[in-house]
Structures are given as C-alpha cells and as structure tokens.
Regions:
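C-terminal hydrophobic helical "lid"/dimerization subdomain
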Residues: 3, 250, 292, 296-342
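N-terminal Rossmann-fold NAD(P) dinucleotide-binding loop
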Residues: 180-181
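NAD(P)H dinucleotide-binding glycine-rich loop of Rossmann-like/cofactor-binding domains
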Residues: 94-174
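Adenosine-nucleotide cofactor-binding segment
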Residues: 173-176, 186-251
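Glycine-rich beta-strand-centered segment in the early N-terminal region that forms part
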Residues: 20-34, 48-99, 140-142
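Rossmann-fold dehydrogenase core element
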Residues: 261-263, 273-312
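Short glycine-centered segments of the SAM/dcSAM-binding site in methyltransferase folds
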Residues: 83, 170, 260-261, 284
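Helix-to-beta-strand junctions that scaffold the AdoMet/dcAdoMet cofactor pocket
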Residues: 256-257
Length: 342
C-alpha cells in the first residue's frame, strides 16, 4: 500500500508499506480522506515540536476517515462497506489515569502519527489502515471529507467541556487557525450569546464569520480593539486561547471578568503571567489536551448535520501531490483545513 512518510524536515516521501494482518477484534479501513494537522506541519517544517524529534521515518496523519474493507471474524460492531471515522486515540485502559477515567492522559498512549515514543507510532496517511473495530465510528450521511474533521472537532469539544457552560456567555477566541475556527462553531452550538474571534490575518477571520463569529478582529490592524471589553473589570465570560501567544493570553486576562474562565488550548513556549490579576479577579485558567470520548459525539454531530463544518475545508489534494498539499496548508492566507484524498 502507499503511505506518506516523513524522514526529516521537508523530506516527505510516498512509499510502499505492507498492510498488516488482521488480528482479533480488528478491521481494515480503506482510507479516503485525511486532514493535515498543525502537528503534521511541525514534523514537515521542523522535524518535530518542542523536545519531540523524528528519530526514524514515520507515516504522518491522524485526522482520517474511510470505508471498512475487511473485518476479523469476531467483529460485530462494524461491517465491510461501513463508512467510518477512525479515532486515533488509543489509550492502554489499565494505567492509573485510564482507570481514573482520564484516557487522554494515558501513560502508554499510542496516538497515530506521534514521534513521542520510540519506536514512533505510525500514522494514518496510507491506503489501508488496520485498527481496532472499537476505534471506528460509523456514519450514514456525511462523506469522508467531513468525517475527517471529527478529530479536530473532538479536540474542541473537549476544550469547551473544560470551560463549563457557555450558555448566554460572551466568548473570546484568540487565534483563528483550524482549531480556533472550530471553537467558534462549537461555541455557537453550545449557546454562547456573543463570540469574538481575533487573529492577525484576515482570511481565517472570514472563515470564522461563516462558522458563527459575531465579531472578527484583526489585531494587527486594530491592536486596541479587544481592550474595549476590559471595562468594569472585564466583559468576557470565557476565553479560549488557541494561538499559544503570550500577548494574546495576557491581553485576554485583562478583559475576562472576575471568576471568568480561560482555556489554554494553543501550544506555545513558557510565559510569565500577572499573578496578582489571577488572584484579584479569581480567574480560572485551565488547560485542555486532546480528547477521547468526545470523538463519538463529534462524528454524530457531523453525520446528522446538526453542525456544518464545511466552511473550514479549503483544499483537497490527491495523496500523490502530498508536497503540494503541505505547501498549501502552510499558507494561512489561502488555506484553513487542507485534506489529502486517497
């Protein structure tokens, strides 16, 4: 089968790999669509992120969907021909965090397309993926291109779960990449009264508008605009920080009301924070990492049409044009979510 393999920064190759044999409880999924994630771009551009580095060739990809081609004899939950989204989260289910109901914090997580462990966990950008049947969420309406959005949407659903109720809240979203745009869509679905989104590029802000943002602010052109929400100790109930930028976080703290919540979703470096403000305003600052059980909900919402994420899709490329696809995904002015078709 064909696979998209990263060897080093900018060294992306289409290689033949053997299809694994089916084991008990497993299925073979013929992959049809795969979304390029920010982590895929980090491997492509830099060979990793933070302290995580490529140490061997690795198949990229974890935002994947396709059709079941074959099932093991003991599999009953899916059948050949089913269209499915594949959950890339594979916790061990027996470590102390799994046993406490925190599978996203699993000590032995085998998340697709990850160079954290050695050997690396190979990803899903391949013609055929053999996986556990329990990883497959069956869909009846949505095409594979929409179902491949379930993984990043699950990330966002988990983050908003960390935020608490959004009903009637004014929500600020800082950073409008694919995750920030999905936060906008999910916040609207969760009953936010007003959604303000900020970025330094106009094009992704236009997509956020289509997904439900009430106000989209280019802070490069209007650097002082968010500050107007700082009156009377702050007018924002919930802030979701998606940029990983210290200035965005600090600026957001100025406008979040007392006892408001800040969810840190974007990955960045170490930052210094005004602790006196955290104390005086009794701010709740929480992190959000990956997802697990939210994946099934994400698939259900997409498949039933209760939420429309198609404005996020800005480009598709056949897998043989993987280099062009990654180049397009790198251009924030022309692309939000780029997908590969297999």
């Amino acid at each position: 089968m064909r696979s998209i393999v990263i060897h080093a920064p900018r060294d992306l190759r289409i290689e033949e790999r053997a299809v694994e044999a089916l084991g008990s409880g497993q299925v073979a999924v013929r992959i049809q669509a795969g979304g390029i994630c920010g982590s895929d771009l980090h491997y492509f551009n830099h060979g990793g992120f933070g302290t995580v580095r490529l140490r061997e060739p690795m198949i990229l990809g974890h935002e994947i969907a396709g059709t079941v081609a074959e099932v093991a004899p003991d599999v009953t939950v899916v059948k050949a021909g089913d269209r499915v989204a594949v959950n890339p989260s594979r916790p061990c289910r027996h470590c102390r965090f799994c046993l406490k109901g925190l599978p996203n914090q699993c000590l032995n997580m085998r998340f697709y397309g990850s160079a954290m462990p050695m050997p690396h966990i190979q990803g899903g950008f391949r013609d055929v993926l053999v996986c556990d049947a329990t990883q497959c969420e069956v869909a009846t309406r949505a095409p594979a291109t929409e179902l491949a959005l379930a993984e990043p949407f699950a990330v966002v659903l988990h983050a908003l779960g960390r935020a608490g109720s959004l009903l009637g809240e004014r929500v600020l979203v800082t950073g409008c990449g694919p995750i920030g745009a999905l936060v906008v869509a999910a916040a609207r679905f969760h009953g936010a009264a007003e959604i303000i989104v900020t970025d330094i590029v106009d094009e992704p802000l236009a997509v956020a508008r289509r997904l439900g943002a009430d106000r989209a602010v280019n802070t490069a052109a209007e650097p002082g605009a968010p500050a107007e929400y700082g009156a009377d100790k702050g007018q924002i109930g919930v802030m979701v920080e998606c940029s990983g930028n210290e200035r965005a976080l600090r600026g957001g703290m100025e406008v979040v009301r007392p006892r408001g919540t800040i969810v840190q979703l974007g990955l960045g470096g170490d930052v210094s924070l005004p602790q006196n403000m955290v104390v005086a305003k009794e701010l709740a600052i929480v992190g959000s990492f990956r997802f697990h059980e939210e994946f099934a909900l994400a698939v259900r919402l997409i498949d039933t049409g209760r939420i429309d994420l198609t404005p996020l899709l800005t480009g598709t490329f056949p897998m043989e044009d993987a280099m062009a696809a990654f180049a397009a995904a790198n251009d924030r002015r022309s692309a939000m979510k780029v997908q590969l078709l297999f």
